[in-house]
């Protein structure tokens, strides 16, 4: 959990989230439970003991601990993705400035990066979702659909998806892998927006 906390603090230092924004979840290989950041806790002050354990089944999810806290309001998003995979897996939802600016300018993120093949070597960018409400089941389902789960490989075809006027969801087999997808896409978004070609 220390690495997850470090990522949240780094995101806050980059102004990618305000104190109570952003959420991260993860599950261990073969587990029927996952852990998620709580709602309303300042991310720069979060501790290991604040994480909430969630059980999963095909009918939904159930909170198992820390009943004085609520799981992130985006729990449906995390449940939809983590309930699909059996491997160790991480889901990161943040609000990076330049990526959101690019989408607000009308760009579909895969179009933004197609002139930058170095990014595509490591990060596969899905089509943006529609303009969907935060915390909604619709947001959760669109993110999972656009990330494109592949049954045979039991993995997703894409690594990151943008939510217009909101943020991104990035996934990976480690917290660093998921976070690096955001770092790469944010870097390219900054380059494109700085070029004044939009």
Give, region by region, the residue ranges found by the protein language model.
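Glycine-rich flexible loops
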Residues: 1-198
């Amino acid at each position: 959990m220390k690495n997850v906390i470090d990522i949240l603090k780094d995101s806050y230092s980059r102004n990618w989230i305000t104190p109570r924004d952003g959420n991260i979840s993860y599950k261990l290989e073969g587990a029927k439970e996952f852990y998620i950041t709580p709602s309303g806790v300042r991310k720069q002050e979060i501790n290991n003991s604040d994480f909430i354990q969630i059980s999963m089944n095909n009918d939904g999810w159930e909170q198992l601990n820390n009943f004085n806290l609520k799981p992130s309001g985006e729990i449906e998003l995390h449940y939809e993705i983590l309930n699909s995979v059996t491997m160790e897996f991480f889901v990161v939802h943040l609000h990076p400035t330049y990526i959101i600016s690019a989408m607000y300018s009308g760009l579909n993120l895969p179009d933004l990066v197609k002139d930058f093949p170095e990014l595509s070597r490591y990060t596969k960018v899905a089509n943006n979702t529609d303009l969907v409400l935060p915390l909604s089941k619709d947001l959760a389902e669109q993110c999972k659909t656009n990330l494109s789960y592949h049954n045979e490989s039991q993995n997703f075809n894409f690594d990151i998806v943008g939510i217009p006027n909101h943020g991104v969801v990035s996934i990976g087999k480690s917290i660093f892998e998921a976070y690096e997808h955001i770092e790469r896409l944010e870097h390219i978004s900054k380059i494109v927006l700085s070029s004044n070609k939009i």
